[in-house]
């Protein structure tokens, strides 16, 4: 858990190194009307800007972690399961998100461990500076994101490279990080929806069968969902659905 906490602070710590340079450059030559920065002092302004940027990064870091890890795919697939079973409130959203979080930690643990050993520990022992810390820390995440897209033709990377007016990269290292993140998010959405459709199919067939039987019996006013719900739950329990879904999600990242 300590490693996960250190990884959570990875984005905020790295931003501080860039904030120091940017804030010092910004305070030189500020000329706002009705404001006299000379009486305040450049160091105080720089510290205030650093604090503002640091708090902003800490606020946005959960969103970055959600989009750059396996949480995106896992959370969408688990939500598809609940909708396929026609269950609106069971299991509760908090439990679904908690399960997605712990599955994310399980699948991302090798990546988190690499960041901890290659970036955080050397920085803690003052063996590397902040720039080296950022490069060593982002490398395992880049490898993880690229590995998830290695099963296709890298259409997402080509799309965002062309939209950014970049030349075609010769290898993985030439892909900018912001392009890789955008491509990874799009790829995860596509994979999650494909998995969700496969989960939906057997339950849709069951709904169609129940609706056809009700129409044949003349029970048109009775909602088919009410009748098919118990059969969906029985089918899901008999095939050990949670184990199949969990193992399938974990194997999809290997």
Swiss-Prot record:
GO terms for cellular component: bacterial-type flagellum basal body; plasma membrane. PROSITE patterns: FLIP_1, FLIP_2. It is found in: Cell membrane; Bacterial flagellum basal body. GO terms for biological process: bacterial-type flagellum organization; protein secretion. It is a multi-pass membrane protein. Keywords: Bacterial flagellum, Bacterial flagellum biogenesis, Bacterial flagellum protein export, Cell membrane, Membrane, Protein transport, Transmembrane, Transmembrane helix, Transport. InterPro entries: FliP, T3SS_IM_P. The chain crosses the membrane at residues 29-49, 51-71, 95-115, 175-195, 197-217, 219-239. Belongs to the FliP/MopC/SpaP family. Plays a role in the flagellum-specific transport system. This is Flagellar biosynthetic protein FliP. It comes from Borreliella burgdorferi (strain ATCC 35210 / DSM 4680 / CIP 102532 / B31). The gene is fliP.
């Amino acid at each position: 858990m300590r490693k996960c906490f250190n990884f959570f602070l990875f984005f905020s710590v790295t931003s501080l190194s860039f904030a120091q340079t940017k804030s010092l450059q910004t305070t030189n030559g500020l000329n706002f009307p009705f404001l006299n920065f000379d009486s305040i002092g450049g160091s105080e302004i720089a510290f205030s800007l650093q604090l503002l940027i640091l708090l902003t990064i800490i606020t946005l870091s959960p969103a970055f972690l959600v989009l750059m890890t396996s949480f995106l795919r896992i959370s969408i697939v688990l939500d598809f399961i609940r909708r396929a079973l026609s269950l609106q409130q069971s299991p509760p959203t908090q439990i679904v998100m908690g399960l997605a979080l712990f599955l994310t930690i399980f699948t991302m643990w090798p990546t988190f461990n690499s960041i901890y050993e290659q970036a955080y520990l050397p920085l803690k022992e003052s063996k590397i500076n902040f720039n080296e810390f950022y490069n060593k820390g982002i490398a395992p995440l880049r490898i993880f994101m690229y590995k998830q897209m290695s099963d296709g033709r890298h259409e997402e990377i080509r799309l965002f490279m062309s939209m950014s007016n970049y030349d075609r990269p010769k290898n993985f290292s030439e892909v900018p990080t912001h392009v890789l993140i955008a491509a990874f998010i799009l790829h995860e959405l596509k994979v999650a929806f494909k998995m969700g459709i496969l989960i939906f199919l057997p339950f849709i067939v069951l709904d169609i069968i129940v609706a056809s039987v009700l129409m044949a019996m003349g029970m048109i006013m009775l909602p088919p969902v009410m009748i098919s719900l118990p059969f969906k739950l029985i089918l899901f329990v008999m095939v050990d659905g949670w184990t199949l879904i969990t193992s399938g999600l974990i194997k999809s990242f290997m």
